[in-house]
């Protein structure tokens, strides 16, 4: 002979979010106002005997269970509980109006440029998508920031007389052992060539004996420069 078990699909209620001090008696007392109760139990830990924070209440009929689940914010023993039919599980938590999601705001400068590329950096074309505007860097500014030598151009040679400069250039040209060719012209520069000067030359007023002596010393120092050694190394 088999005993018939009552169907509790629509009468058994899951109660979650209970305080640890809630007992079977206090749980039953809360649900008595909705109708007759067949069972009210708080689930406890077997080893410690403390409440696990949830329980089950079985109402006598389906109508009483529906009334017990209507309240969206039930308060049991001073704490908001989660009440729903057991076969449905716990109710999803309802977000309060005005709940703000933690979305990080982006700076306008990062939105305007893909991947937040700053404007004062120069990136290779292979790493930049088409459409990214990269500021143009003047060649003179780039050369001034990268060259380790002192560029002795116009202003630096102003202290020498035109005659001394012409004589020095002629002396340097006479010492070059190779004939001029189109291939060799790429190695010869006449203006803006960088030299490492060890001792500064004292400027003197033009038309004086000191100016003539300074010009002669500059011509002699310039004439001792032998560019053929540098050219030989490059052509080997």
UniProtKB/Swiss-Prot annotation:
CDD domains assigned to the protein according to its UniProt record, in alphabetical order: RRM_RBM24_RBM38_like (cd12384)
Domain RRM: 11-88
Keywords carried by this UniProt record: Cytoplasm, Differentiation, mRNA processing, mRNA splicing, Nucleus, RNA-binding, Translation regulation
PROSITE patterns (UniProt xref): RRM
An individual GO BP term: positive regulation of 3'-UTR-mediated mRNA stabilization
Subcellular location: Nucleus; Cytoplasm
Region (Necessary for interaction with EIF4E): 175-199
Alphabetized SUPFAM superfamilies for the sequence: RNA-binding domain, RBD
InterPro entries referenced in this protein's UniProt entry, alphabetically: Nucleotide-bd_a/b_plait_sf, RBD_domain_sf, RNA-binding_reg, RRM_dom
GO molecular function, one term: pre-mRNA intronic binding
Coiled coil, from the record: none
Free-text function comment from the UniProt entry: Multifunctional RNA-binding protein involved in the regulation of pre-mRNA splicing, mRNA stability and mRNA translation important for cell fate decision and differentiation. Plays a major role in pre-mRNA alternative splicing regulation. Mediates preferentially muscle-specific exon inclusion in numerous mRNAs important for striated cardiac and skeletal muscle cell differentiation. Binds to intronic splicing enhancer (ISE) composed of stretches of GU-rich motifs localized in flanking intron of exon that will be included by alternative splicing.
Subunit text: Interacts with EIF4E; this interaction prevents EIF4E from binding to p53/TP53 mRNA and inhibits the assembly of translation initiation complex.
Protein name (record): RNA-binding protein 24
Gene source species: Rattus norvegicus
């Amino acid at each position: 002979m088999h005993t018939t078990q009552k169907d509790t699909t629509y009468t058994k209620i899951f109660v979650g979010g209970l305080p640890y001090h809630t007992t079977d008696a206090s749980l039953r007392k809360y649900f008595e106002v909705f109708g007759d109760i067949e069972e009210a139990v708080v689930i406890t830990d077997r080893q410690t005997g403390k409440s696990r924070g949830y329980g089950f209440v079985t109402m006598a009929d389906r109508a009483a269970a529906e009334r017990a689940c209507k309240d969206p914010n039930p308060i049991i023993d001073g704490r908001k509980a989660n009440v729903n039919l057991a076969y449905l599980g716990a109710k999803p938590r309802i977000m309060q109006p005005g709940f703000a999601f933690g979305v990080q705001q982006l700076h306008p400068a990062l939105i305007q440029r893909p991947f937040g590329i700053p404007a004062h950096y120069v990136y290779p074309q292979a790493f930049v998508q088409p459409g990214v505007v990269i500021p143009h860097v003047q060649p003179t500014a780039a050369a001034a920031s990268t060259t380790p030598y002192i560029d002795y151009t116009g202003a630096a040679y102003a202290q020498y007389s035109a005659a001394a400069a012409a004589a020095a250039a002629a002396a340097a040209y006479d010492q070059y052992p190779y004939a001029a060719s189109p291939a060799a012209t790429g190695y010869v520069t006449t203006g803006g060539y960088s030299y490492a000067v060890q001792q500064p030359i004292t400027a003197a007023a033009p038309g004086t004996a000191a100016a003539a002596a300074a010009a002669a010393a500059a011509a002699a120092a310039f004439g001792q420069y032998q560019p053929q050694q540098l050219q030989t190394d490059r052509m080997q």
